[in-house]
Structure formats: C-alpha cells, structure tokens
Amino acid sequence: ILYRSNKLGNEIHTRSEVSNKAVVEICGIVNHEGYDFLLVGSEKSMSNTPDDIAASHYRASFYNRYFKRFKAPESWFYPGALLKDKTKMFIEQSNCPVGVFVNRNFVKASNVIVVIDSEEDLFLLGYAQTLLKSTHGSASVLDKSSSTTPGNEVIKEGILRFTEDVKQTTLLREKDLTPQSFNGFNFMLISYKTWNDVSEHRKEALQKMPSTLILSK
C-alpha cells in the first residue's frame, strides 16, 4: 500500500497500536476522528496468495491433528464464523461506509464485475464509476434480480443509466453467479448483504472469484 501510494503521490500516515479489543478501538478511531471510509482486510483463508494458502493448510492440519479427535467444533478454531461477526461489528459500529478487501493475487482492477441483487445494491455503481476513472478499465454488471424483486424497475433503470453514461460498461446476459462468471475479470464489487447470500449459496462459484471489495453503505 505504501509503495503504491508513493507512486501515486498520495500521502499515507501509518499508525500502530496493540489492543485485545481491536474492532472496538478501530471503530472508535473511525467515529471520533471523522473518517469517511473504513477499509479492512479479510481473513487469510479467503486469500489465494501462496503464503496465505500455506497458512490455511497449516491451520487445517493442526486442527485435524490435535482438535478433531476431541470432536471440537471447527468454528472454535477456524476464523470463518468469527470473521463474519467481526465484519458485522465493523459495519454496525462504524458511522461510515465499510469495505472488506479480499486479496486474490491482486495486481489491478482493470476488468471489474459488479454484482447487483437488489435496489440497495445500486450504490455500487457509484463506486464502479469512480474506480474506472482511475483505472481507465471496464466494468460489467451482473444483475441477479428478477421480475419479482422489489424495485425491479428502479434496478433496471439504474443499470441502464450507468451503462449509457459511463464508457466501457456493459450488462451481462447471465443472471446468476457460476464459476464461469468470473472469466476475464480481475476484480469484483459486491455489497455486504449480497455477499452474505452468495457466500452461503454459491460457494463453488466463489472459489473462482477474483480480488474482491465487499462494501456496505
């Protein structure tokens, strides 16, 4: 981050603190010091970088060797459930939008897929437009909504306006996330609410996902 910021000429101030209540402390800083966006990293098990994969494999091996024989729930040892709770705490306790970054060998965000599942997700199009201004890349919208989705007409109008007003943007024909949905994309924008849904019901597809930014309003 510091390297990229220096290349872009952006100034970043680093800050280090030790706390056993990290979420509370971070949210306190965000709220009391007037920040307008909070960006946090996801757990290592969601990453596909070599070091993080190795760490996840070691953790799995350690659990299977020492804990499984005692029938201890994996949730005691694996941070998946804890991460969900922690992310929820960041979102609920912060007075600003929150982004959770999932690193999947991130290099650049030049080909972006934006997942829209409800009227509430339309705010992602604003993030996509801002992103394209800096990357000069392209964005494609995957509209998961159906004719029975509340606000369906508003969703269609919002996406149509986005694809007409912003260069290098398209609406994908497909309506659902599959492993093939991510072919050709190196970045995904998705809302926290929709992420919770697809992470439960489209686990196979997410194995192929690119680097991702999970956003809350």
Predicted segments — roles?
Residues I1-H13:
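Membrane-proximal soluble helical/coiled-coil segments
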Residues G9, V24, D36, V40-K217:
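Intrinsically disordered or low-complexity boundary/linker segments at protein termini
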Residues S16-V24:
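Charged docking surfaces used in two-component/phosphorelay signaling
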